[in-house]
């Protein structure tokens, strides 16, 4: 079956249709936003991957919920370096964890 791809979605807010998919960026810097649970109640276990095959960084932002950087525990917007890859997983109704190469 594989992992469906959304190619160069631009500045983008995650939707329910993105569960199990990957966003593939090959051009300019963009921002991917994870919506607040109060705006879009995605299920616990929802996950998506970002592949940044561009020569610039991509931001991964979160609105009012919490985005934890795996292995560190810091919260907030993350930066995915050029040619980096990251996976985000919803772990509670208002918490996500993210990990990957080139992620700060």
Question: Where do the language-model regions lie?
Answer:
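Generic detector of low-complexity/intrinsically disordered segments
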Residues: 25, 69-71, 91
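Extracellular jelly-roll beta-sandwich "head" domains, especially the C-terminal globular C1q domain
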Residues: 76-104
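Terminal beta-strand-rich extracellular "head" domains
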Residues: 64-82
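Exposed extracellular interaction/assembly regions and N-terminal maturation sites
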Residues: 1-64, 94-104
């Amino acid at each position: 079956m594989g992992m469906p791809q959304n190619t160069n979605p631009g500045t983008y807010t995650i939707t329910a249709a993105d569960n199990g998919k990957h966003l593939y960026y090959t051009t300019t810097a963009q921002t991917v936003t994870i919506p607040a649970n109060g705006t879009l109640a995605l299920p616990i276990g929802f996950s998506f991957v970002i592949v940044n095959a561009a020569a610039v960084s991509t931001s991964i932002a979160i609105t009012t919920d919490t985005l934890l950087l795996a292995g560190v525990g810091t919260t907030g917007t993350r930066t995915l370096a050029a040619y980096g890859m990251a996976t985000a997983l919803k772990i509670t109704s208002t918490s996500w964890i993210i990990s990957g190469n080139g992620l700060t």
